[in-house]
Amino acid sequence: MTALEPRPGVLLRVLPPSLYAGRASKVVERSMLAYSRMWLVFVSGVFEPLFYLLAFQVGFGRLVDDVVGPGGQPMSYVAFVAPALLASSAMNGAVLDSTYNVFFKFRYAKTYDAMLATPIGPLDVALGEISWCVLRGGLYAVAFFAVMLGMGLVTSAWAVLLIPVALLIAFAFAAVGMTCATFLRSPSQFDYIQLAVMPMFLFSTTFYPLTVYPEALRVVVQCFPLYHGIELMRKLSVGVFDVAMLGHLAYLLALAALGLWGVSRRLSRLLLS
């Protein structure tokens, strides 16, 4: 098989070559080479959520009593917040990578125009950029989980599933974030992105349970994508399972699929028309 021959796969059989050529890994390789010269920037992303976690352990954790966790069992406030911070970290990292970086590659560097001049399709670009966000988020998730383990915040063997859930959260938000980036016209419009991300971080039960809200507001909060990621992680962290977890999982999978479809269509329309 030569370098220009497409690799076999289901998508290659059902999608036209102009949309998908099976070379998303080449986009990931490009990102790896680019960040090999900026490894300090790459590594620094893991510290922000860790600082939050340490602040809660040293400060708030000593001031707040145990709270009621999933399944009605008591848990320390730090253990309650830790899975939510991991989910928030996956969201923030994915949104940052898939909006700022993608915007400048798309609007100024014209990176994607150059890519599409090669045997690479818009879906390859979308999958490659999203996969890079997921890879980066996965490394951060492993580091965060290791700190949780060292701080004694992991009480169930099921908590190891926090890492794949973090990858799913990163994929979903990266896909949606990349789609949004294609609509931006100037750097000042990134404020709109933060206007959506910040309320989700603050109000998606990150720091307190859903029951603190009035009934009407609970419905609004339950529409937030981050809420579903946090609830899924929080239950896995203590080994509690219920039917609602399937709903949380389905929501994130649907969001990921919708975002991937949206960004591939946008790139096709903007770069191939």
Task: Cite the ranges covered by each PLM segment.
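Hydrophobic transmembrane alpha-helices and immediately adjacent juxtamembrane helices
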Residues: 1-273
